[in-house]
Amino acid sequence: MSTLLLQNLLENGTEFYFFIFVLAIVLLIILSVIGKFISLWFQAFVSGTPIPLFNIIGMSLRKIPPREIVNARINLYKAGLKDIHVGDLETHYLAGGHVPNVVEALIAADKANIPLDWRRATAIDLAGRDIKAAVQTSVNPRVIDCPNHGGYITGVAKDGIQLNCRARVTVRTNIAQLVGGATEETIIARVGEGIVSAIGGSDTHKQVLESPQKISKLVLEKGLDSSTAFLILSIDIVEINLGENIGAKLRTDQAESDIRIAKAEAEKRRTMAVAQEQENLAKVRDMEAKLVEAQAAVPLAMAEAFRSGKLGIMDYQRIQNIQSDTDMRNALAKPDSDKKQN
């Protein structure tokens, strides 16, 4: 009897221990799965901003990294930004935003007394702008080289002297215009345009060399940062070099052009004179032909006069004498060269 009772106790004890072993394994598995959630819950609890455990587990089910959201909430709470809740962080993450960047930007802006709320920060982040870098630029202004590739801004004063200069523009981010505002390239282009215009408005290049700060002042007064994502704090001219004498070069080119025009006009007049001369020669040849024709008609007219009795022998002799005198005078009037040719 005692033997049977001992066997029953051993069998029941084995089942009990097996049940305890299985239960321990299940508990270990459950603890390994939810242990990280419990750790995050405890971390939030001791930080003074408790988050329900089931809410943390739900983040994982919604494909939201719980550690990122919990750490962001703790950082905001410790920084004094207690009006931003876990739901806001989850919504921004699901919208494709960068929660850590937004949180760091909000904390930095709050410490630097820069007006930036959660709604605007998330809008800037979702627009594709780096809100963290923008706030850092607002706190620590950055310097932009103009031009930004090591070249020069070239302008020409009214006296024709070319000036090559470089400038440095100190800017900080304009949070209000960060979404939709023009970028750094626009600032560089506008500053370059303003410097060229200011140099071009100077009477002489010496005025620019003597007072480069006047150029900076004129450029700043134009409000070049309107509709951009930056506020221009200062424009400093760091280098000015003399270039070519563009005015003299232009005058030289103009003089050469005038010479070519004058030569063309002279050639045109010469050609017209030659053409007129040839035309006059043609007229002379025509008149000579008419003269020869008229002279050929004289003997016929004289013969007709003899037949009709209108011309006598004495009249004919007188005409011959006059013709001889005329030939003699013509011979005396000819140059020596014409006489030799004859």
From Swiss-Prot:
Pfam families assigned to the protein according to its UniProt record, in alphabetical order:
FloA (PF12127)
Query: Any transmembrane segments, and where?
Result: 18-38, 39-59
What are the alphabetically sorted keywords of the record? Cell membrane, Membrane, Transmembrane, Transmembrane helix
Q: How does it sit in the membrane?
A: Multi-pass membrane protein
Primary subcellular site in the record, as a coarse category: membrane
Source taxon at top rank: Bacteria
List locations, semicolon-separated.
Answer: Cell membrane; Membrane raft
Q: Name one GO cellular component term.
A: plasma membrane
Check the record and name the InterPro entries matching this protein.
Answer: FloA
Give the protein's biological function. Answer: Found in functional membrane microdomains (FMM) that may be equivalent to eukaryotic membrane rafts. FMMs are highly dynamic and increase in number as cells age. Flotillins are thought to be important factors in membrane fluidity.
| NCBIfam families according to UniProt | PRK13665.1
What the record says about family reads: Belongs to the flotillin-like FloA family.
What binding partners and quaternary form does the record give?
Homooligomerizes.
HAMAP family, per this entry? FloA
Name-wise, this protein is: Flotillin-like protein FloA
Q: What organism does the UniProt record list as the source?
A: Protochlamydia amoebophila (strain UWE25)
Could you tell me the gene encoding this protein? floA
